[in-house]
């Protein structure tokens, strides 16, 4: 497989789906390009019009195996034959414990370790904020300009990437201070290291 463009971009099928999306979906995401995914294989993504692209996004953060990796597909199929969903808050599940134990063994920190599973990075940020407040008694946070943490209210309060993401949601959680990264290659204050 290799990249191949078969239609003008976006193609006719993609344009129809994008138009339908704009009518039916909440405009809560900023999509940078008019791509409508049909399927993927490894590093390639094919749109609904048959155009093949080299996918430099390949999912968010945790899907670094590429699209449709055979081992991942097999694991999903095996699990789907048992059950599709369970809540770790309602009952226990052996595989969940095994994954938690493996993470605890491999996390390079000393002392007592425990795992908290979430559905998303935003939920992980919310949990981290709650843990920080609970264990320190403090309620202020430092976050970086240009950093993205999620779209839930707490995570959005820390997010410093796109102002449009916060539009209509003020006031956000108080006590968040945004600062620049401590890297002056492109210093926002036009300063240099001594």
Regions found by a protein language model. Give the residues of each.
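Glycine-rich loop-to-alpha-helix module at the N-terminal edge of alpha/beta enzyme cores
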Residues: 4-7, 52-142
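PLP-dependent aspartate aminotransferase-fold enzymes
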Residues: 101-194
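Structured helix-beta-strand junction loops
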Residues: 20, 24, 79-83, 172
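Residues in well-ordered beta-strands of folded domains
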Residues: 6, 46, 180
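Active-site-adjacent loop/helix segments that line or gate small-molecule/cofactor pockets in enzymes
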Residues: 1-41, 91, 96
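Short beta-strand-to-turn element immediately C-terminal to the catalytic PLP-Schiff-base lysine
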Residues: 46, 65-66, 157-159
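Active-site and channel-lining beta-strand-loop segments
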Residues: 34-56
């Amino acid at each position: 497989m290799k990249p191949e463009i078969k239609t003008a971009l976006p193609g006719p099928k993609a344009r129809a789906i994008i138009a339908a999306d704009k009518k039916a979906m909440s405009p809560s995401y900023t999509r940078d390009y008019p791509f409508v995914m049909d399927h993927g294989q490894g590093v390639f993504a094919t749109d609904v019009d048959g155009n093949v692209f080299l996918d430099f996004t390949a999912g968010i953060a945790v899907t670094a195996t590429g699209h449709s990796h055979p081992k991942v597909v097999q694991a999903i199929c095996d699990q789907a034959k048992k059950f599709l969903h369970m809540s770790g808050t309602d009952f226990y599940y052996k595989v969940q414990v095994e994954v938690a134990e493996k993470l605890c063994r491999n996390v390079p920190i000393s002392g007592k370790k425990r795992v908290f599973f979430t559905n998303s990075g935003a939920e992980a940020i919310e949990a981290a904020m709650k843990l920080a407040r609970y264990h320190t008694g403090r309620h202020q946070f430092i976050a970086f300009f240009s950093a993205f943490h999620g779209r839930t209210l707490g995570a959005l309060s820390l997010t410093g990437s796109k102002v449009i993401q916060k539009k209509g949601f003020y006031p956000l959680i108080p006590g968040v201070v945004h600062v620049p990264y401590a890297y002056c290659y492109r210093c926002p204050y036009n300063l240099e290291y001594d």
